[in-house]
A protein has these predicted regions:
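Residue-level signal for secondary-structure boundary elements
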Residues: 17-20, 33-44, 65, 69-70, ...
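Sequence-level detector for compositionally biased, low-complexity segments
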Residues: 243-245, 272-273, 291-543
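Alpha-helix initiation and N-capping motif
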Residues: 2, 21, 25, 50-55, ...
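Eukaryote-specific, cytoplasm-facing alpha-helical/coiled-coil scaffolding segments in long proteins
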Residues: 4-11, 83-85, 114, 388-391
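SAM-dependent methyltransferase catalytic region
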Residues: 49, 61-332, 341
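Long recognition/docking surfaces used for binding and targeting
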Residues: 1-66
Length: 543
């Protein structure tokens, strides 16, 4: 039924495999045959990972096997208490705000997880929907309910093949547990696709993936045309996004289908010199969800993401845009930001609900049909991870738990701030008006090579770099230097070799307060010189 998986397994079982492929498959089979599954499961439950071993096996495996991909794609399983809280909140709000008596179980509800992983969010939504149905109507008609609602109206997208395959297996298990066995011509609508790419894939020649273009076509139709009422999930966190294309650029920067872009504020350009954090993947997924709901005219978004957008000035256009689309926004800041060394208000330890350093927040956003205006509500949740899990596991969404914020131009903060004197504050000159020539700091993009505590050490490195008898692989191995989109190592070495003034680029650098080092300040090495400002610091100056 699932074209891609059918193609892959058919190819492995009956296809003409190369000798290398046969060895790989045989090795995998031997490892699986030798695995003590009961012991693994006992260890899993002993460590308190939750109810769903499929999810954790995948994330743990990827962390060991390919940590770069895990980091690049932002693969972090969502703790089940978080998932349960969000799905319960959506179910409750469908009933109370949209007067849909059966909540997620209603036939008029369409649901999408655009970054599905192993289907943790859709799985929980299905459990809630089936429970609602059984409580109201009993077991009679349950099979028909699953066929005509769950398999018809629930969608999910996933980019990576492994979680895609696991997700389909998991869904088959779940539905069987709920008393429904899928027929040969049925499938759950999880599609292998990049949510942030609107182009249909062309027919591929890769063995075992002949159905990829068909899968892409189905997904594209949902992205572009299918009205979605509920969008949930845990989008990837990746500051250096791999998702850069013309469509995402338009989605973020321009007004699309009436939804204000994130690069404007109060009708004016943001004028941010460094707006790279608006390119983070989680921002793009939130924007995609906002666009789908805005286009549909009503709906709910329930997601857990990086919490930086709540108060970072760069995101003020994003905050205003969300307020222009949604009528009610509920934000639970789960904190846990070790990068900021966050602590609980009483000075006790504050932990993240994920195994990451970046703090996170749950957002539940509601758009009602033909409604105007927006109210933003906020709640803090500090403390130990287990206490946060306990709260999210047991507590239901209650509006009075959240505090109404006074969100004002030009910042539109999504956290509690005293804004009583904001107009007085805004009447003062901005610092960039006082200092018209300004920038952020130098970016070498290769500090370990371009900066040193001792000038002689740095001179040795540059001497090696200019010596064309050394291979570029040497610098990759010893200094982690390699070409990037903005810098070519071969070109830089060649140009520096020809530069007769190469010995004139050593300067003292205040790397951090009271931390003086030496930098090789040349565009052949330093990626962003910030020369308009730094040229004033190169010689004697009050600065």
């Amino acid at each position: 039924t699932i074209g891609i998986l059918k193609n892959v397994f058919k190819f492995i079982s009956f296809g003409s495999l190369s000798a290398q492929m046969e060895v790989i498959i045989d090795d995998i089979s031997e490892v699986l045959q030798a695995a003590d599954v009961n012991k693994i499961l006992n260890e899993f439950y002993k460590n308190g990972k939750g109810e769903d071993p499929i999810v954790h096996f995948y994330e743990t495996f990827l962390n060991e096997y390919d940590p770069e991909t895990k980091e690049k794609r932002g693969v972090y399983y969502t703790p089940e208490p978080v998932v349960k809280y969000i799905i319960r909140a959506v179910h409750y709000l469908l009933k109370t705000k949209f007067k849909i008596a059966d909540g997620i179980a209603s036939n008029e509800v369409t649901l999408l997880d655009p970054a599905a992983g192993t289907l943790t969010f859709p799985a929980e939504a299905i459990k809630i929907a089936v429970e609602e149905f059984e409580n109201k109507f009993g077991n009679a008609g349950k099979e028909l309910f699953i066929r005509n609602h769950i398999l018809k109206n629930f969608y999910a997208f996933e980019l990576m093949m492994a979680p895609y395959a696991i997700g389909h297996i998991k869904m088959s298990f779940l539905l069987e547990e709920l008393g429904y066995i899928m027929k040969d011509d049925e499938r759950f609508k999880l599609y292998l696709t990049n949510t942030l790419d609107m182009e249909d894939l062309q027919q591929t020649e890769i063995p075992g993936l002949e159905s990829l273009s068909t899968e892409s076509h189905y997904a594209a139709n949902i992205k572009k045309n299918e009205p979605i009422l509920v969008i949930v999930g845990n989008p990837p966190y990746s500051g250096h996004s791999a998702n850069r294309n013309e469509w995402t650029n338009t989605l973020l920067k321009e007004e699309i289908d009436g939804a204000q872009g994130y690069y404007t504020i109060d009708g004016e350009s943001l004028n941010e010199k460094n707006s790279k954090w608006l390119q983070d993947d989680y921002v793009k997924f939130l924007r995609f969800a906002q666009w789908k709901i805005h286009k549909a005219g009503l709906g709910i978004v329930g997601m857990i993401t990086n919490h930086s957008y709540l108060d970072n000035p760069t995101f003020r256009g994003m905050r205003q845009s969300l307020m222009n689309t949604f009528n009610e926004i509920y934000l639970m800041d789960l904190h846990g930001n070790s990068l900021k060394k966050e602590m609980s208000p009483d000075g006790s330890k504050d932990e993240n609900v994920f195994d990451i350093r970046q703090g996170v927040a749950i957002a539940v956003m509601i758009k009602k049909k033909n409604a105007r205006g927006c109210k933003v509500y906020h709640k803090d949740l500090f403390g130990l991870r287990k206490d946060k899990y306990d709260f999210l596991e047991k507590e239901n969404f209650i509006k009075k738990d959240y505090e109404l914020l006074d969100t004002k131009s030009p910042t539109y903060f999504f956290i509690k701030r005293n804004t009583s004197d904001i107009e007085y504050y805004n009447n003062w000159h901005k610092i960039n008006e006082i200092f018209p020539v300004n920038s952020v700091g130098i970016v070498t993009a290769r500090d370990e090579f371009a900066i040193a505590f001792e000038k002689n050490k740095l001179k040795e490195r540059i001497s090696q770099f200019r010596n064309l008898n050394f291979s570029s692989d040497f610098f990759n191995s010893f200094y982690n230097l390699k070409s990037t989109g903005a810098w070519d190592i071969e070109k830089a070495r060649s140009e520096l070799f020809k530069d007769n003034n190469y010995d004139n680029y050593y300067y003292k650098l205040l790397y951090r307060p009271f931390d003086e080092r030496t930098i090789y300040y040349s565009p052949k090495i330093v990626e962003r010189m910030r020369y308009d400002v730094m040229r004033h610091m190169l010689r004697d100056n009050l600065g």
